């Protein structure tokens, strides 16, 4: 078959093998359309875009079979359910846009997965290797929302998740190496932690003393949960749990490590945590002058 494949408005059921030489995409689900991929394999020699694309208002249900050979396994701007099977792409295995909702119960997505909309994961396996997101197997982009209660991220249970949006973690049915949390990322724990989670925090442009990891969905982090959270930070930073705000915050241990005072600003003030302040306040203050000297000042 050569061309643009199927543009579908109503209900289409696929349960046969499809071999493709050159195609832009196999299936495009238009608003109001529904495709049920019950089984069969879709093998492409040269798919220039994706195997299937779901527009806003379209529905795709993928149950079994293997699809491969495209730059993308799928693009989703509608509603997608993945129950099983294998989906792969050379750039991304899958990509969910801002209007899309993808729910994954099982199966395997190979080549990396990008979420810019809403993705709910209770099972399945995610494998990297695509050119789109480098060493990561899952990328939750800025503005994206991901809920993970199950699934394996990486070929042997170890893989890296990037979070630049909102990430909800619950249950103990998921496995990965660590989460890399970007400056705009927020992580919400929505249930008791039964496994250790490892999180790298990117402190570039991050707002210090602002909760980064919190309880969510009416769940409050407990002391036992905190023991199961390992946070990896660059030198000069530390973290602590702020019970009054129900979350983990990042603070500077040096405060003035990389701060330069110019000639027009003779003195800079910092509180004990290293946060810049406009003037001296009660308690311990750190003062840095333009000649490079620092001193501690206690105000009673």
Give the location of each predicted region.
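Glycine-rich beta-solenoid repeat tracts in large extracellular/virion proteins
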Residues: 4-8, 21, 25-30, 43-45, ...
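All-beta strand scaffolds that present successive hydrophobic residues in beta-strands
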Residues: 12-15, 20, 31, 35-38, ...
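Hydrophobic alpha-helical segments, especially N-terminal targeting/anchoring helices
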Residues: 29, 54, 241-243, 270, ...
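Extracellular/surface-exposed low-complexity segments
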Residues: 151, 170-174, 181-253
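Residue-level detector of functionally pivotal "anchor" positions at catalytic/ligand-binding pockets or at interdomain
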Residues: 251-273
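A glycine-anchored, Pro-Gly-centered beta-turn/N-cap motif
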Residues: 281-285
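C-terminal tail/sorting-segment detector
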Residues: 286-300
